[in-house]
A protein has these predicted regions:
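N-terminal secretory signal peptides that target proteins for export/translocation
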Residues: 1-10
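Acidic (Asp/Glu) and glycine-rich low-complexity loops/linkers
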Residues: 2, 28-138, 146-158, 165-177, ...
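Sec-dependent signal peptide hydrophobic core
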Residues: 9-20
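C-terminal motif of bacterial Sec signal peptides marking the signal peptidase cleavage site
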Residues: 23-27
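Short beta-turn/strand-loop junction motif enriched in small, turn-promoting residues
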Residues: 55, 120-122, 140, 160, ...
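Short, surface-exposed interaction patches in beta-rich subdomains
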Residues: 166, 181-287
Length: 287
């Protein structure tokens, strides 16, 4: 009888331990349900600041005067702040272990958009953003499928960040790309030009397709690369130094200088007499 009582006690203790473990496991189990948070907005959003390794989707919602945030991480990891004039900040805390989680941001933002992302954020947009757009990416962040029309665009990338499939239709384009960062243009159309300048530093890359009916300025140093055979240029100013490699297509003239092991391959240009090339560099015509 005593042995039977002892066995029953052992069974009850084992059952209690298993039950406690299951309760603890359920308590610790991550809630993967996509949650929503509505952020009241007074007027247009002009600036979006993203910090953290998010997969971010920014879509336009013209029927709502608020920003709707969707996410699948604990709410304690998120801080949002909206302040005038139109600045929305979204920050993630305790970033370890939540890489690849979802952050979707639906906003009414058709103009005056400024995006800043760092610490590995991956941003995708839908819709056409008008007027000016300034984009600042650092810490291996990404911006994908961005479309900007009817204004200027300024891109500043560092820390191996990337912009992929950018569409720009306007008259003022500036890009400052450093630390192995990359910009790829799906389409650029500039029929008139109040400014077009691309600067590459430290093995960065600029590529794409389209047409620029003016004279942009390409500046590159330290092994950077221009892959722009598919961008039809009217003319071009170049300043390359330190092993820069460039492929360009220009219908009129190319002028500027190549130095310290840089190489320029070009198509179509009718006049290259104003390009100075040092003894370590070369310029090659592609038929």
């Amino acid at each position: 009888m005593k042995n039977r009582t002892t066995q029953i006690k052992k069974i009850l203790i084992s059952f209690s331990i298993v039950t406690a473990f299951v309760v603890l496991l359920n308590a610790c189990k991550e809630d993967t349900t996509l949650k929503q948070q509505e952020i009241p907005i007074s007027g247009e959003i002009t600036r979006i600041y993203i910090e953290g390794p998010w997969d971010v989707i920014i879509t336009q919602d013209s029927t709502n005067n608020s920003a709707v945030l969707e996410y699948d991480v604990p709410e304690k990891n998120i801080k949002t702040e909206y302040s005038t004039p139109g600045i929305l900040r979204v920050k993630v805390y305790e970033m370890d272990g939540i890489e690849g989680k979802v952050l979707r941001l639906r906003i009414k933002a058709t103009a005056l958009l400024e995006i800043e992302a760092l610490d590995g954020a991956k941003i995708q947009t839908s819709g056409i953003f008008r007027s000016y757009s300034d984009v600042y990416l650092s810490g291996a962040s990404q911006l994908n499928e961005f479309w900007c029309e009817d204004g200027h665009i300024k891109l500043i990338l560092s820390g191996a960040s990337e912009i992929n499939n950018l569409t720009y239709i306007g008259s003022n384009f500036h890009a400052h790309i450093i630390d192995g960062s990359k910009v790829n243009l799906q389409n650029i159309q500039m029929s008139s030009c109040s400014g077009c300048q691309v600067k590459l530093f430290n093995r960065s890359e600029f590529s794409g397709s389209g047409r620029i009916s003016c004279t942009p300025s390409f500046f590159g140093v330290d092994g950077s690369v221009f892959k722009t055979f598919d961008i039809e240029l009217a003319s071009l100013d170049v300043d390359f130094s330190g092993g820069v490699f460039a492929e360009v297509t220009a219908s009129h003239e190319i002028k500027g200088k190549l130095s310290w092991g840089s190489k320029l391959k070009y198509k179509k240009a009718t006049n290259i007499s104003d390009v100075s090339v040092d003894e370590y560099s070369e310029i090659i015509k592609i038929e």
